């Protein structure tokens, strides 16, 4: 999604560890910025905007008709009813899930507010690539790795405090 209004998601690779500090941007994930669309707003060119896990993701496999389900315990790679894959198409659903949590916490959020909250609450990664345009955006990770807890918490706090309007990404 390179559209101005879309939230573009990059994929990270956890290097098969539980330690998020060693996560890297996946080699197949697009880097930014996107090509200038001549709209006069350099912030629109800062894509991707967020990153999320997208490498070696375990997924459920449909096995009712294939007969491959064996309900084995142990390594998920060998049980016949799960599979795995990698790609930004694996990273994007987790960000969609975060958006759902945010809307559960605060149904009054606008699409623009959701996008800004996700960017604001992201776990920052890498040095700012274009600090003259934005002090946090990085060409690999966007504004950072999506943080479901912080994004949902901010959504709830905005609802609880009856705050509306734009989120200031500089504070």
How should each PLM-predicted stretch be described?
Residues 53-136:
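Hydrolase catalytic cores
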Residues 1-59, 119-122:
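Catalytic-core segments of hydrolase enzymes
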Residues 4, 23, 45, 90-93, ...:
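Conserved active-site and cofactor/substrate-binding residues in soluble primary-metabolism enzymes
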Residues 137, 145-171:
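Secreted peptidase-domain scaffold signal
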Residues 5, 27, 49, 82, ...:
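Short, flexible coil/turn micro-motifs enriched in small/turn-prone residues
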Residues 30-34, 62, 146, 150-151:
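Short capping/connector residues at structural and topological boundaries
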């Amino acid at each position: 999604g390179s559209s101005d209004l879309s939230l573009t998601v990059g994929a990270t690779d956890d290097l098969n560890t539980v330690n998020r500090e060693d996560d890297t941007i996946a080699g197949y994930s697009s880097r930014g910025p996107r090509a200038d669309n001549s709209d006069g707003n350099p912030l629109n060119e800062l894509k991707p905007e967020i990153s999320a896990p997208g490498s070696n993701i375990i997924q459920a496999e449909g096995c009712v008709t294939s007969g491959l389900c064996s309900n084995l315990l142990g390594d998920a790679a060998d049980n016949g009813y799960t599979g795995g894959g990698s790609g930004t198409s694996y990273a994007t659903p987790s960000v969609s899930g975060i958006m759902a949590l945010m809307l559960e916490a605060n149904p009054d959020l606008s699409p623009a507010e959701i996008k800004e909250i996700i960017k604001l609450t992201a776990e920052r990664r890498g040095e700012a690539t274009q600090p003259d345009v934005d002090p946090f955006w990085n060409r690999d990770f966007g504004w950072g790795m999506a943080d479901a807890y912080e994004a949902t918490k901010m959504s709830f706090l905005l609802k609880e405090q009856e705050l509306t309007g734009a989120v200031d990404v500089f504070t």
